[in-house]
Amino acid sequence: RNKVKQVKFPFHLRVPKWCKQAEIRVNGKMEQTVKGGKIAIVDRIWKRNDKIELYLPMEVFTSTWYENAVSIERGPLVYALKMEENWEKKEFKDSWYGSYYYQVTSSDPWNYGLADFDRNRMNEVAQVSINSQKQQLDFPWNQENAPVEIKMKARLIPTWTVYNEMAGPQPFSFCGSAEGGEQEITL
């Protein structure tokens, strides 16, 4: 058994860039705050049973992709429109990639544009709900068990259509092309 009661060393923690400002606590007391994208160093004398906690507050934000497509993100996750999933097993003739794969399709509408889109107000317009019971599940990586949902207002864009069995090019402008009133969508 090791007789050393305490030891001094630096403890390095990487704070991801998506986190605006993290908090580090040692034994329940605030040690320091660190901006995202930085390495925090807690250099101290450590004793047996010391406890270090890293808090990474998650905010809703957006990122822009090809053809000005916008994705909704919160913390390290990118959210997708919640849709009914139809899973179909497909066989490969050539086993180079495996013997089969699953094709996932949906008959639900997918071509929505965000109705109240303002990058600077995402935490106001996006309603985040966290199901604490689902947070305890062993496998949260599917729609049924996902513990976090984001609800937003959107409008259907009928001019944005399927092309080659996938989402076609986005219309240059959605002005005047939205159909019907605002709907609440779930991501």
Feature roles, as predicted:
Residues R1-N2, K35, Y55-L187:
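C-terminal beta-rich recognition modules with glycine/proline-rich loops and embedded aromatic residues
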Residues Q6-V26:
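Beta-strand-rich binding/interaction modules
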Residues F11, A40, V70:
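A broad, low-specificity signal marking well-ordered, structured residues that form hydrophobic/aromatic
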Residues C19-R44, T62-E67:
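Solvent-exposed beta-strand/loop surfaces of large extracellular or lumenal domains
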Residues W46-R48:
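Surface-exposed, short loops/turns at beta-strand junctions within beta-sandwich domains
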